[in-house]
C-alpha cells in the first residue's frame, strides 16, 4: 500500500481540488414556444431554434 513521504499542505490539497467543482447545465429558451431546454438540444415539443423539426407525439408513439 502506498504511503506518502511528506504530508500535503491544505493549500496544495485545495489547489488540486480547484478543478472538482460541478457546473450547472447551460439552458436556453426557445424563441417560438418559450420553453427551457439544454443547449443544442430540441425542446420536448420538438422545436429547435424556433422551427418544428419533429412531431414529438407521433415519434413517441412509434417507439
Swiss-Prot record:
Organism, as annotated: Legionella pneumophila subsp. pneumophila (strain Philadelphia 1 / ATCC 33152 / DSM 7513)
HAMAP family: Ribosomal_bL32
Identification of the protein by name: Large ribosomal subunit protein bL32
Comp. bias (Polar residues): 25-35
GO aspect biological process, one term: translation
Disulfide bonds: none
One Pfam family from the record: Ribosomal_L32p
Compositionally skewed regions (Basic residues) per UniProt: 7-16
Gene Ontology molecular function terms on file: structural constituent of ribosome
Recorded name of the encoding gene: rpmF
Annotated keywords: Ribonucleoprotein, Ribosomal protein
Membership in a protein family: Belongs to the bacterial ribosomal protein bL32 family.
Claim: Coiled coil is one of the keywords in the record: no
Lineage top rank: taxon: Bacteria
Stored PANTHER family: 50S RIBOSOMAL PROTEIN L32, LARGE RIBOSOMAL SUBUNIT PROTEIN BL32
GO cellular component entries: large ribosomal subunit
Region listing for Disordered, in residue ranges: 1-45
Organism lineage: Bacteria, Pseudomonadati, Pseudomonadota, Gammaproteobacteria, Legionellales
Amino acid at each position: 500500500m502506498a504511503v506518502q513521504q511528506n504530508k500535503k499542505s491544505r493549500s496544495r490539497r485545495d489547489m488540486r481540488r480547484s478543478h472538482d467543482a460541478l457546473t450547472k447545465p447551460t439552458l436556453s429558451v426557445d424563441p417560438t414556444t418559450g420553453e427551457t431546454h439544454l443547449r443544442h438540444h430540441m425542446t420536448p415539443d420538438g422545436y429547435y431554434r424556433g422551427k418544428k423539426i419533429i412531431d414529438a407525439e407521433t415519434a413517441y408513439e412509434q417507439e
